[in-house]
């Protein structure tokens, strides 16, 4: 389910790298400019995703025609048919992903969404040193610098919510997992979940002691 805050997190994620490159603290106007760029990126994603879906579906149709008229051998025809079906499935999955994007774009223009995205970005920049220290302490046999830029931003946005914006820890973790599933590599969400759970326990020693 798409919510205003989920969209705000996506906008913050798409803007995070630019924010962390800035040598001085950004004001609200600077953040709004970055968010506008993020909205344009989302709009571009809609077009790209639909174009890719069309390409996959067209290729699947071509392969099916090829297998019907030019492949008399059953085994080879079956291989081509399997490839065609995989491409068709990939195209349909891309269309399914694109269906959410118009609603995301609708939310992205709302003031409450942009205001929350700005709060995330400004906290991310203002408390960067504290956030990095907390994340590094919670990594097991890993270092923050070795994370992909995307995974690092997802983790740090969740830390901002848990530590500075008083979002319930489990909510922040769950939302980070959803961001990872949407934007990061397959399997990254499990790693991110583990890191954030350790951070949650570090922020709440009583929770760590009881195991809840």
Curated annotation (Swiss-Prot):
The keyword NAD does not apply. One of its GO terms (biological process) is DNA-templated transcription termination. One of its GO terms (molecular function) is RNA binding. GO terms for cellular component: cytosol. It holds the Pfam family NusB. It comes from the Bacteria. Signal peptide: none annotated. Keywords: RNA-binding, Transcription, Transcription antitermination, Transcription regulation. InterPro entries: NusB-like_sf (IPR035926), NusB_fam (IPR011605), NusB_RsmB_TIM44 (IPR006027). The keyword Hydrolase does not apply. Belongs to the NusB family. Involved in transcription antitermination. Required for transcription of ribosomal RNA (rRNA) genes. Binds specifically to the boxA antiterminator sequence of the ribosomal RNA (rrn) operons. PANTHER family: ANTITERMINATION NUSB DOMAIN-CONTAINING PROTEIN, N UTILIZATION SUBSTANCE PROTEIN B-RELATED. This is Transcription antitermination protein NusB. The lineage of its organism: Bacteria, Bacillati, Cyanobacteriota, Cyanophyceae, Acaryochloridales. The gene is nusB.
């Amino acid at each position: 389910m798409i919510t205003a805050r989920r969209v705000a997190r996506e906008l913050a994620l798409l803007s995070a790298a630019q924010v962390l490159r800035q040598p001085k603290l950004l004001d609200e106007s600077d953040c709004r400019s970055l968010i506008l760029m993020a909205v344009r990126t989302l709009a571009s994603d809609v077009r790209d995703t639909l174009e890719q879906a069309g390409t996959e579906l067209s290729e699947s149709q071509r392969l099916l025609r090829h297998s019907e008229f030019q492949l008399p051998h059953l085994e080879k025809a079956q291989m081509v048919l399997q490839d065609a079906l995989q491409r068709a499935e990939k195209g349909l999955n891309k269309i399914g992903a694109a269906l959410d994007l118009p609603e995301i774009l609708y939310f992205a223009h709302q003031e409450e969404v942009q205001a929350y995205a700005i709060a995330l970005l400004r906290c991310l920049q203002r408390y960067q040193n504290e956030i990095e220290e907390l994340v590094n302490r919670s990594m097991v046999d890993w270092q923050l610098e070795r994370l992909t830029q995307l995974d690092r931003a997802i983790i740090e946005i969740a830390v901002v919510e848990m530590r500075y914006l008083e979002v319930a820890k489990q909510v922040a973790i769950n939302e980070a997992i959803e961001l990872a599933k949407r934007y990061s590599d397959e399997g990254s969400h499990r790693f991110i979940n583990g890191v954030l759970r350790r951070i949650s326990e570090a922020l709440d020693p009583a929770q760590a002691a009881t195991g809840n």
